[in-house]
């Protein structure tokens, strides 16, 4: 009887321990599930940030390509502007040379005009003096007058050419100034684009480093989630085993309680028989 009680007590303790282990396993399971859920949420957040980083990286790469294209266009425009400036410089050189030649011709024409005017003045004075000279002298005077007219025409033509060359020179100088302004603007734009390109490149490097960091952290979280999943499975297995142990212990306890009840019934029956026997002996 004592052995049965002792065994029942031990079974009850085993049952309580099994229940405690099952509850602890359930607690561990819930804690692991909560932690896994938290890690999954954090992983999802990291994946979202990584996706945003990748989108920002794509945007930065697109900006970088655009900046490179703009820089190439600016360099091409600057090269075109430099070629245009060089062409204008050549044209200015040619115009200056033509202007120098025109000035030389003008100087010669003015000199001839001055000589012709002097000759005309002398001729005029001489004409008054020698009005009555021979026809030959009159012809010489006519020739000198013709030479004077030609000299005046040459001087007027030189003046017109000088004015035209000066006008062309002003136009070319204006075109040169505009070309230089465009070249300066293109150089300034190229410098701005180079600075923007440097900034974009630095941002790109920073984004690539962030992407690598997030990727490494994602791997760590995935490994930790795997570990927790394994622990969760182990906890579930232990909980299942504990539940089975509890069921088995409860079954054993029920069987022992039935046995105890049967023994009590037997003892009661024996006690009743003993009472009847003792009463019969007393009646004798």
UniProtKB/Swiss-Prot annotation:
GO CC entries: actin filament
Role description: The function of tropomyosin in smooth muscle and non-muscle cells is not clear.
Subunit structure as annotated in this protein's UniProt entry: Homodimer.
Gene this chain is encoded by: CTM1
Tissue: Predominantly expressed in body wall muscle and heart, low in intestine, ovary and larval tail muscle.
Family matches, as Pfam families: Tropomyosin (PF00261)
Keywords from the UniProt entry: Coiled coil, Repeat
Record remark: domains: The molecule is in a coiled coil structure that is formed by 2 polypeptide chains. The sequence exhibits a prominent seven-residues periodicity.
Disulfide bonds: none
Family membership: Belongs to the tropomyosin family.
GO biological process: actin filament organization; muscle contraction
Residue ranges that the Swiss-Prot or TrEMBL entry lists as coiled coil: 1-284
Ranges where the record places region Disordered: 18-38
InterPro entries registered for this protein in UniProt: Tropomyosin
Protein name: Tropomyosin, smooth muscle/fibroblast CTM1
GO molecular function terms listed in the Swiss-Prot or TrEMBL record: actin filament binding
